[in-house]
Regions:
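Short, conserved active-site entrance elements at the starts or edges of catalytic domains
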Residues: 4-37, 42, 53, 186-189
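Alpha-helix boundary recognition
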Residues: 26-27, 86-87, 146
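Short beta-strand segments
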Residues: 29-77, 83-85, 91-96, 103-107
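Short, intrinsically disordered, mixed-charge
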Residues: 86-91, 127, 131
Length: 189
């Protein structure tokens, strides 16, 4: 860990992100990977677009009353994972950048807001997603499919952890193994 990396993004301080850093990270177009449970108990993971509302947006009356903020996902009408979440709302998800090692890891529940509807609340959220993932012309991607029903889920994190920088969390470090200390390995000594 002592050497410097060419990509300066790797030089971020090792540790948790601040609320501001989390907000900046979540505004980027990284895919959310959602894990839910099939009816037989097997895990199922799906990549999906997401929209993040931070706690202050929730407090200002966005319709979300989550204490940690919330994530919105929009499955298509025939998506199996929408049924999985409807039947068992327990889920986990991660949003990460494998180049910079930034990540947000969550555990929580999925709240069904709309079940397979056309022209619901999901449209405005999908437009925000399309801009973030596809750029200013992103909403034009939605136009030919606006007549197709979709679900809307609010993912409510009960646990939310963040990480940035190349390095180990101190809690993983085993002391007295004969190598450098955690601080030495992370250039903090």
């Amino acid at each position: 860990m002592a050497e410097k990396y060419e990509n300066q993004e790797h030089q971020k301080p090792v540790g948790k992100m601040s609320a501001e850093e989390m907000g900046i990270f979540l505004e980027k177009g990284y895919t959310l990977r959602l894990a839910c449970l099939k009816p037989n108990g097997d895990p199922f993971v799906v990549p999906c677009w997401h929209h993040w509302e931070n706690k202050s947006e929730c407090d200002r009356g966005s319709g979300c009353d989550c204490i940690n903020g919330c994530f919105w996902v929009i499955p298509r009408s025939r998506s199996k994972w929408a049924e999985y979440l409807k039947n068992d709302p327990r889920c986990s998800w991660v949003i990460d950048d494998d180049q910079t090692m930034e990540k947000i890891l969550c555990e929580g529940v999925a709240e069904l807001v709309e079940e397979s509807v056309v022209n619901g609340k999901w449209v405005g959220i999908a437009e925000k997603m399309a801009v973030r993932y596809l750029g200013p012309d992103g909403p034009t991607y939605l136009v030919p499919t606006l007549n197709q029903p979709r679900w809307l889920f609010r993912l409510r994190p009960t646990k939310l952890r963040s990480w940035q920088g190349v390095g180990w969390a101190k809690s993983y470090w085993v002391k007295e193994t004969g190598g450098p200390s955690w601080k030495e390995a992370h250039n903090l000594a």
